Structure formats: C-alpha cells, structure tokens
UniProtKB/Swiss-Prot annotation:
Keyword hit for DNA-binding: yes
Cell compartment(s), UniProt: Cytoplasm
Protein role: Can catalyze the hydrolysis of ATP in the presence of single-stranded DNA, the ATP-dependent uptake of single-stranded DNA by duplex DNA, and the ATP-dependent hybridization of homologous single-stranded DNAs. It interacts with LexA causing its activation and leading to its autocatalytic cleavage.
Gene Ontology cellular component terms for the protein in this record: cytosol
UniProt-recorded name of the protein: Protein RecA
Species for this entry: Herminiimonas arsenicoxydans
Coiled coil: none
Gene: recA
InterPro entries: AAA+_ATPase, DNA_recomb/repair_RecA, DNA_recomb/repair_RecA_CS, P-loop_NTPase, RecA-like_C, RecA-like_N, RecA_ATP-bd, RecA_C_sf
Parts of the chain that traverse the membrane: none
Taxon lineage: Bacteria, Pseudomonadati, Pseudomonadota, Betaproteobacteria, Burkholderiales
Length: 367
C-alpha cells in the first residue's frame, strides 16, 4: 500500500524536476528557486532617512533598497528635505545618487547644507513625464545608481499635454503613464537593488461627503507598487523668541510591506539645517533610559552633557562620535540594526546557493 501511495508522489517530483529543467533552460538559472535555499530570502538592506525617529518607525532602520517608496504631503511639509537627507546618508555609505527634478525647483545651496556632495550627485531636469521616467529606467537598468529621487509625480506632465492647447481635456493620461512606467521599472529596481523614491502632492476629491477627501496625483498604480508610503505633515512651528526657526513634523507610515505599518514619528525640521538629529537622539535616548534627564540637565554615562535641550543638542553636534554611540544604543535597545556600508550588489537571481538544492539533485536524476 505504501509503495502505491509513494508512486504518485515520485511521479509528481519527476514532473516538477522536468518542468524546472525546462524553465531554467528557457529563462536561465535561478528563474525558480526554493525559499529555504537562501538564494531568495535575504536581510533587507536599508538607508537612513536622516531622522532616527522615522528610521525606528519604519521597523528596519531606514528605507529599503530594491523597492519603490512614495513620500507625500501638503506643500512645505518637508518632503524634499527628507529625500535630500536620504541622499546625503546614501552618499556617506559610498552610494551613487540621482535627483530627477521634474519641478525644476531644486535648491542646490540647501542640498549642500544638508550634507550632499554636489559633485557626486547626478541631476536631471526633464522636459516631459515620459523623458523623466525613461531616464529613471535607464539609470536603474545600468545597475550603477543606488538611489533615485523623482520630484514630483504631479510634475510628470505627459508629452501630449505639453504639446496640446491649454484647455484640452486629457483624462487619465498621467495615470496611464505612471502605470506603464511602474510595470516596466519594478523588476529592474529589484534586480539592481536600487531605491527609487517618488515625491507626491495632495489633491482634494470634489464632492466627498464622508471619509478622507484627500488623494495623491498620478492614479492608483504608485499606491500598489510602493513598498513604503509615508504621509508627512507639519504640525506646528518652532520659535526662538518671536522668530520662527523651523517646523514640528509628523510622519505616518501608511503602508509598509517589510514591517508593521501605521507607526508614527515626530521630529523637528530646522530651516537651513534639516532634521534636528541631535534633538531626536536626546528625546529617544531619554525615553529608552540611555540618556538620563534630571530637571533641565541631560547626562550620559554619569557625565552631564548640557543644561536644557539646546545646550545638550549643541554638545552632541560638536561631538558626532558620541551622538553616533548614543544613537546605536537606542537602535539596539529597540531591535533595529545599525546602518553599515553598502555590500556588493550582485543581482539576487544570479547569486549561488550555499548548498546544492533539492531541485539540482532531481535534475541530475532526470538527465
């Protein structure tokens, strides 16, 4: 009886092995693999956003490489600042970055203040949406670019709209453009381990009585293809006396395919400086009991580092090694890995398995 039961199973194994042999012959080795062989499942490589609180809210310590990310929010909420900081962090790891400026509004002086090496940054100011997405596709396929930012989806104007008259009605043209581009881009992005960030704007749906009337531009394709979607909002102002020197900012992770979603991060964006990273380290460090706070004094390892948040922040700014040490302890306490250097990014499909797979043995038997 047992032999009869095992016979169909053996036939199925041989049929599967033959099918796998045909697939590998037609599409190349690694087209289909078992998950347990370790050739597919890998630790997600990430790059910091420049905000410790947001890195922690993302669950893996930053934005994932080899994925599409969407950052959206109202005007002057910090979208471009966040992406420029991410570029600066990627450059610190030795990565190559590109900025596709469809809005033709990049402030290079501000980018430099945020720590970006302009001589190493690739920049494009395309004339049409098709041109912008073709440039993005070419850069991704090259495998030589680690991070691409497109600013913004709303500015990706289809060629037909530019060449037409002002009053022409062209419904759904931009949505179709985005849908086609993302279908083409997604596979290449994953193979080359490139992080692609789309900045998007908010529009209001007309006639919505119940629910959220807000929506993003460019149709629904980006919502589906994005592994991470961040909703960034300005919640208040930071003042020094009567002068406004920055914004209080809230970011909600509204979609996350690599960690639990719906977490929030609160941080400060200072004008001309970007995210107050030292301020975040103090706040999150005191929450994790790594930095001691007694009255107005902040202390670390029994040594006082400043009276009042401003003094403590300046102390850490002058001592980046100490700030990094505290940040790594905060990350470790919450189970988020430290950010390391970029590894060699050979396409996943071509990486050899550590052990010979079961399919390989079966294929030998078939042959």
């Amino acid at each position: 009886m047992d032999d009869k039961k095992n016979a169909p199973s053996s036939d199925k194994s041989k049929a599967l092995a033959a099918a796998l042999a045909q697939i590998e012959k037609q599409f190349g080795k690694g087209s289909v693999m078992r998950m347990e062989d370790g050739a597919v499942v890998e630790e997600v490589q990430v790059v910091s956003t420049g905000s410790l609180g947001l890195d922690l809210a993302l669950g893996v310590g930053g934005l994932p490489r080899g994925r599409v990310v969407e950052i959206y929010g109202p005007e002057s909420s910090g979208k471009t600042t966040l992406t420029l900081q991410t570029i600066a962090e990627m450059q610190k790891l030795g990565g190559t970055c590109a900025f596709i400026d469809a809005e033709h509004a990049l402030d290079v002086t501000y980018a430099q203040k945020l720590g970006i090496n302009l001589s190493e940054l690739l920049i494009s100011q395309p004339d049409t949406g098709e041109q912008a997405l073709e440039i993005c596709d070419a850069l991704v396929r090259s495998g030589g670019v680690d991070l691409i930012v497109i600013d913004s989806v709303a500015a990706l104007t289809p060629r037909a709209e530019i060449e037409g008259d002002m009053g022409d009605s062209l419904p759904g043209l931009q949505a179709r453009l985005m849908s086609q581009a993302l279908r083409k881009l997604t596979g290449s992005i994953n193979r080359t381990n490139t992080l692609v960030i789309f900045i998007n704007q908010i529009r209001m749906k007309i006639g919505v009585m119940f629910g959220n009337p807000e929506t993003t531009t460019g149709g629904n394709a980006l919502k589906f293809y994005a592994s991470v979607r961040l909703d960034i909002r300005r919640t208040g102002s930071i003042k020094s006396g009567d002068e406004v020197i920055g914004n209080e900012t809230k970011v909600k992770v509204v979609k996350n395919k690599i960690a639990p979603p719906f977490k929030e991060a609160h941080f400060e964006i200072l004008y001309g400086e970007g995210t107050s990273r030292e301020g975040e380290i103090l706040d999150l460090g005191s929450d994790a009991k790594i930095v001691e706070k007694s009255g107005a004094w902040y202390s670390y390892n029994g040594e006082r580092i400043g009276q009042g948040k401003d003094n403590a922040r300046n102390y850490l700014k002058e001592r980046p090694e100490l700030a990094r040490e505290i940040e790594n302890k905060v990350r470790a306490s919450l189970g988020v890995p430290e950010l390391g250097a970029i590894k060699s990014d050979e396409p996943v499909a071509k990486k050899a398995s550590a052990k010979e797979s079961k399919e390989a043995k079966e294929l030998k038997e078939v042959e």
